[in-house]
Amino acid sequence: MPRRREVPKRNILPDPKFHDKTVAKLINVLMLAGKKSIAESILYGALDIVAQKTNDEAVKVLKKSLDNIKPALEVKSRRVGGSTYQVPIEVRPDRRVSLAMRWLIKYSTLRSEKTMKDKLAGEILDAYNSRGAAVKKREDVHKMAEANRAFAHYRW
């Protein structure tokens, strides 16, 4: 338990183009070394590609793909009497979103397309269609939690 006062959660402003907080958060996660304008151009370019390929609203597709990546359960290490158990726990709603965004960006960087816009657009489309590396990561995390279900009583 923290001994200091609880740190207030900072309010995030919506992005200028879509006026959406999810897009603004994703820009902040995508940003490297404080270069926000570059992160914005990458994400907006990727969302333009997504809008062209799906003939649908880009933000709606992005939110659906993030929903397909969000994990419901994860495992946490818990030490009990000299041995460490992987204990399955539910993921808090804010952590679900942040994990989904991190996985989306991580697995889009590993793709083979040429530019980051194309990589990110490809991963968003794959997640929208419930396939791709980020969705596989979620499935692996769920499998791990299901395999360690016997240790669920060590939850704290």
Curated annotation (Swiss-Prot):
Q: Name one GO biological process term.
A: translation
Name a GO molecular-function annotation: structural constituent of ribosome
Its biological function? One of the primary rRNA binding proteins, it binds directly to 16S rRNA where it nucleates assembly of the head domain of the 30S subunit. Is located at the subunit interface close to the decoding center, probably blocks exit of the E-site tRNA.
Q: Which Pfam families match?
A: Ribosomal_S7 (PF00177)
- What is the annotated quaternary arrangement, including any partners? Part of the 30S ribosomal subunit. Contacts proteins S9 and S11.
**Lineage: superkingdom:** Bacteria
Q: What is this protein called?
A: Small ribosomal subunit protein uS7
Taxonomic lineage of the native organism: Bacteria, Pseudomonadati, Thermodesulfobacteriota, Desulfuromonadia, Desulfuromonadales
CC annotations in GO: small ribosomal subunit
Q: Which InterPro entries match?
A: Ribosomal_uS7, Ribosomal_uS7_bac/org-type, Ribosomal_uS7_CS, Ribosomal_uS7_dom, Ribosomal_uS7_dom_sf
Kindly state which keywords UniProt assigns to this record, in alphabetical order. Ribonucleoprotein, Ribosomal protein, RNA-binding, rRNA-binding, tRNA-binding
Which family does the entry's similarity section mention?
Answer: Belongs to the universal ribosomal protein uS7 family.
